[in-house]
Amino acid sequence: MSNTKPKVVELQTSETYDLRTAVLRADTPTSDPKYAEDTKQGTVHLGIFDENKTLIATSTWVINPWQHDLLVTAVQLRGMAVATSHQKSGLGKLLLDAGIVHAKTLDAKYIWAKARDLALAFYLRNNFVSVGDGFTEGVTQMPHHLVVREI
């Protein structure tokens, strides 16, 4: 990547599919990158492109209640994917920070996610807490934990 700071931009849903498939569907029983909430009103897709205009990071932000506090607004983070060649470079944190800004515009109290165990340390480093026991997520068949952050 160049020395300029990567810029987070809003994406069309379809722009997320190739990167989601490459990162989030590798070694899983499915190759379908679509989520039911992709077209739900209020859903926002964020991304970062490299200097060649290739999408290298994406995340999806869905207004969805947090199960332990249903009376307040919450935003679910879905589809956080950073290209393998760019992982551990700070792009996930940039997407997270932009998503938090978005959630605050909605007066959300929480951001939550179903975090893959492989990415759990990222969420914990970024002030999320793990809630409850781990579980195997149905679509990917990978171990996950619920994580939440109050904002």
Where are these regions (language model features)?
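A short beta-loop-alpha structural element at the N-terminal edge
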Residues: T4-Y17
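Acetyl-CoA-dependent GNAT
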Residues: S14-D18, A22-T73, R78
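Residue-level recognition of the GNAT/N-acetyltransferase active site
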Residues: R78, A83, R116
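Conserved acetyl-CoA-binding loop-helix of GNAT-fold acetyltransferases
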Residues: V82, K88-V101
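Conserved GNAT acetyl-CoA-binding A-motif
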Residues: L96, A103-R116
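C-terminal "cap" of GNAT-fold acetyltransferases
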Residues: R116-D117, T136-I151
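Conserved acetyl-CoA-binding loop of GNAT-fold acetyltransferases
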Residues: L124-G134
